[in-house]
Amino acid sequence: MKTRDNPLKMQVEKNVVDIVTIAGTRPEIIKLADLVQLLDGQGNHALIYTGQHYSDNMKSIFFDELKIKPDYDLRCDTSDVATLKENMLKYLREIKPPHILVYGDTNSSLAGALAAKEVGSTLVHIEAGLRCFDLSVPEERARIKIDSISDYLFPPTELARTFLSYEEIDKNVTVTGNLVVDVCKRLAKVADEYGRHYDLPDKYLLLTMHRQENVDERERLEMLRKHLSGIEHKIVFPIHPRTKNNLSRYGITLPPNVIAIEPAGYLEFLYLLKNCQLVMTDSGGVQEEAIVLRRPCVTLRHVSERWETLLLKANVLFPLHRRDPLSDVIEMMLDAKIERNPYGENVAGRMLHLIKEITQ
């Protein structure tokens, strides 16, 4: 993909790339949007998009809506860490950036962190310190590894910093808040014009589900159907293609109270989220967005890295194998009073200041 007349190559020739940000998935792109715009304004920054979540539709939806463009698109279309790293190294060895930023716990982030160490760049890990304390979760293993090799760590909360200290990671650790706050609040203000085309009930619950352990097994999908059929409320479900294909493959039909719609762009999704009564999800990012927009959340997993949302009683865990009715938990959470957002304000601006201090 050639973007901005391939400015990355132009910057390489001028030898002015000081900071490279690496991203490859929807959550990373969303959360990094405001920070990337600020870094681009400094004139010494390049964004590498790995294509871990690759599709022309996703790129156009997210990059156009979020007003950012990758300087280089690797089009890897894979989640294999070794392949992602090798593709990055082709360009990082040429650029030799002094600093590399990675976000969160994706395979793109892990590959970027490993590549940074290989080329000798200073590694900054944004969203450091999240822990679910279950090593069977691939993201848990990734974030532990990334944190262990990072030169600077930006945990979003004091609790995340505490988790790092348990692992004896105390040097160059700064609590920054969560970048999702800036993007979510800014775009929620304009989301209505992107959601007007939906024909939705006045009151509805929102459902998102994409994790492999939930959507790839017939038994889990049958459990989902059973739980959803016991809920009296209408449920709007922007259905992930993987989930849709597996439902069809197993011959499982959604109950009548579920309104399945096409996958939503980010602004469309914010419209659905801000107008719902409650969201059910297995997404870490949606747990964060829900509390920012003061929407109760039920997380369809047995663990969560977003402890703050659980401690504030804005979120509750409900793994699909539970025998008690999901409907009972829904009714309880509909009365949840969400009084504050634990993730800070003006996070991108604060983070830019910290990055400037590191790179000077």
Kindly give the residue locations of the regions a language model identified.
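N-terminal subdomain of nucleotide-sugar transferases
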Residues: K2-G51
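A nucleotide-sugar donor-handling region in carbohydrate enzymes
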Residues: K2-L8, Q52-N57, R75-C76, I146-V215
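Active-site and donor-binding regions of nucleotide-sugar-utilizing enzymes
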Residues: V20-A23, E28-L38, F62, D73-E168
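Conserved nucleotide-sugar phosphate-binding/catalytic loop shared by glycosyltransferases and other
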Residues: N44-T83
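Donor-nucleotide binding loops and adjacent catalytic segments primarily
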Residues: S55, K59-F62, A191-N275
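Short acidic-hydrophobic, aromatic-tinged amphipathic segments that line or gate anion-handling sites
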Residues: D73-C76, P155, T174-T176, I259-E262, ...
